[in-house]
Amino acid sequence: MKTTPFTEKHIALGAKMHEFAGYNMPIEYSGIIDEHLTVCNGVGVFDVSHMGEFWVKGPHALDFLQKVTSNNVAALVPGKIQYTCFPNEDGGIVDDLLVYQYEPEKYLLVVNASNIEKDWNWCISHNTEGAELENSSDNMAQLAVQGPKAIQALQKLTDINLADIPYYTFKVGEFAGEKNVIISNTGYTGAGGFELYFYPDAAMKIWDAVFEAGAEFGIKPIGLGARDTLRLEMGFCLYGNDLDDTTSPIEAGLGWITKFVDGKNFTNRSMLEKQKAEGTVRKLVGFEMIDRGIPRHGYELTTAEGDKIGVVTSGTMSPIRKIGIGMGYVKPEYSKIGTEICIDMRGRKLKAVVVKPPFRK
């Protein structure tokens, strides 16, 4: 299994470790619910060094990105970030990702750990524009410091005014005595906070500084288990569950990152435009349980009469709401807010209702 610069630290701290995307990663420390609430109410730290990072540079960088991504990269300026996806030729999604505009002809792509090799091969094989591509996935470490107290803790470690970094923007500067750290107002939790990118040799210095700065706020290390419950409470999609090679961005409710602007002829644009105009055969919805039960990936969604209408893609017990919540694809006629549906949980039909995420208000 691959490791991150923090793997030994996780083991020393007693984390429950498990393989994820080929990496030995911490799943939980004190427990998923405790960690979830720590992030919602205070500050927690996630090792997300397993994520992939590609640089796209040169005079052809923008043309390349306009072709392979769904969002309008031309709308970015240096210091801004965009959520987007790589559409494939069959109407599905290769991956969802973030695009950082670093300089006028320099972009950073941050991709899912499970898709690094697939995404890299996709970029290489579609680079007919001649953009300069560089895979820096093994040369970057990343911590996500999340929660309402994150800004107070991190402000102690930099002269950059973190209040001047709005959501989905970033600055590059000195942090904890290390130069060229990317400080990004992003996250996968809905609790606020920052993501830090730095060289692996600075990893332990930055970890120790962050935990020292956050001690007065009860800072804790957080595992991937709580990362999943936090993102699901916000209704954020997870690749491999809610998105995959067969789900289109229009079906997944990602029309807002699919921009049909003049001159942007991205992969499979015409099919996605047709879907936007004519509708899709299924839609991703959020739902919460009426009956007691925890929905899980793969459970069937049915009508009260037992007719199959879809499938659960993500589900959990909400630590905040203390009810079962989930997402899944249903036939469009069952996607309206307030529609009652059923989840087939091992032969038991349990009632749920379609709602608009986030589940955590």
Swiss-Prot record:
Keywords: Aminotransferase, Transferase. The keyword Transferase applies. GO terms for cellular component: cytosol; glycine cleavage complex. The keyword DNA repair does not apply. It catalyses: N(6)-[(R)-S(8)-aminomethyldihydrolipoyl]-L-lysyl-[protein] + (6S)-5,6,7,8-tetrahydrofolate = N(6)-[(R)-dihydrolipoyl]-L-lysyl-[protein] + (6R)-5,10-methylene-5,6,7,8-tetrahydrofolate + NH4(+). The glycine cleavage system catalyzes the degradation of glycine. The glycine cleavage system is composed of four proteins: P, T, L and H. This is Aminomethyltransferase. It comes from Bacteroides fragilis (strain ATCC 25285 / DSM 2151 / CCUG 4856 / JCM 11019 / LMG 10263 / NCTC 9343 / Onslow / VPI 2553 / EN-2).
